[in-house]
């Protein structure tokens, strides 16, 4: 029986497993192929202000529009955003703050045209993003995500990301990102191969490589999605300086849980209850928004406790 199982039955079981894997891959491929082609023009506006007008959005799967309206596994039972109005001026740095799941990341997905709104408009330079094709938006919007993905290629190619930039141009971007010295210390410098998912680099080092990418791209609109989340005390100063260099002369949206990141921003928008409830300078929003005021009070208490502990340790 044992011999029969090994020679006849087990191969059939393995065949069934392989067939199931193939079906799963085909299903995934179909989801990708069903994503609609972005339509629109390639003439990007010279003015880079951003506006959301009466925006409503949910991740509801909708027949032929599939992934365009959320075919990425979100249940779509309720609107993520309702009646959202926000104006970000050309060259301004705007922070989006709010609890996890409030809709901050959804706003930047709509600005980047990862999805289209169900109601309302998203405008760049007065033009509806639906009038712009995706390649045009991709060239003019740079995003530094919370988690940096590195390919199993050289450090040079991970920064260049398919562009024709020279080594000198890549190094100039890396210097602004405060990562050039680290790269030059690697065994093969910029030709050093990156391990699987960047395993040989710390979170802060990967973050600065992502910032170097964005500096090299030099897009007029910049989105920082929790861009300081991977930093640690040893490289926080370098990341702060890198982000300051990156933000120069750009329209910037900052999504942040760390309130310390708000020092980069001109104004703050609070996202809660599926909409934007307050917009203004830090002091204005702190006066009029209970959530924001409480968040800052908690942050300051925690910071004071940390300072006291560090002081006590130093006096011990």
Label for each model-derived stretch:
Residues 35-36, 115:
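Two-component histidine kinase transmitter core
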Residues 5-32:
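Cytosolic ends of transmembrane helices, especially the final helix of ABC transmembrane type-1 domains
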Residues 32-35, 161:
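Coiled-coil segment of the histidine kinase dimerization/signal-transmission module
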Residues 45-316:
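ABC-type nucleotide-binding domain
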Residues 38-40:
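Active-site phosphate-binding and catalytic loops of NTP-dependent enzymes
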Residues 20, 43-46:
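Residue-level detector of secondary-structure boundary/capping sites
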């Amino acid at each position: 029986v044992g011999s029969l199982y090994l020679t006849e039955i087990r191969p059939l079981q393995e065949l069934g497993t392989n067939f199931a894997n193939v079906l799963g891959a085909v299903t995934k491929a179909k989801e990708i192929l069903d994503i609609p082609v972005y339509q629109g023009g390639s003439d990007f506006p010279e003015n880079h202000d951003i506006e959301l007008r009466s925006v409503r959005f949910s991740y509801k799967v909708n027949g032929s529009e599939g992934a365009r309206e959320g075919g990425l596994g979100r249940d779509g039972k309720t609107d993520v955003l309702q009646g959202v109005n926000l104006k970000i001026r050309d060259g301004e740095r705007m922070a989006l703050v709010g609890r996890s799941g409030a809709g901050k990341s959804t706003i930047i997905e709509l600005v980047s045209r990862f999805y289209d709104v169900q109601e309302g408009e998203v405008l760049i330079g007065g033009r509806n993003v639906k009038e712009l094709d995706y390649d045009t938006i991709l060239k003019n919007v740079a995003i530094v995500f919370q988690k940096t993905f590195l390919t199993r290629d050289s450090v040079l190619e991970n920064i260049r990301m398919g562009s024709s930039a020279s080594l000198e141009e890549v190094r100039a971007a890396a210097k602004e990102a405060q990562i050039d010295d680290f790269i030059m210390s690697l065994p093969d410098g910029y030709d050093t191969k990156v391990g699987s998912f960047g395993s040989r680099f710390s979170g802060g080092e990967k973050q600065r490589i992502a910032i170097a990418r964005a500096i090299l791209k030099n897009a007029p609109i910049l989105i920082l999605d929790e861009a300081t989340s991977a930093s640690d005390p040893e490289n926080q100063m370098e990341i702060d300086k890198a982000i300051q260099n990156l933000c120069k002369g750009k329209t910037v949206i900052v999504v942040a849980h760390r309130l310390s990141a708000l020092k980069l921003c001109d104004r703050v928008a609070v996202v809660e209850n599926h909409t934007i409830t307050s917009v203004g300078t830090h002091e204005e929003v702190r006066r009029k928004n209970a959530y924001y005021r409480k968040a800052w009070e908690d942050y300051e208490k925690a910071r004071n406790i940390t300072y006291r502990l560090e002081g006590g340790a130093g006096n011990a």
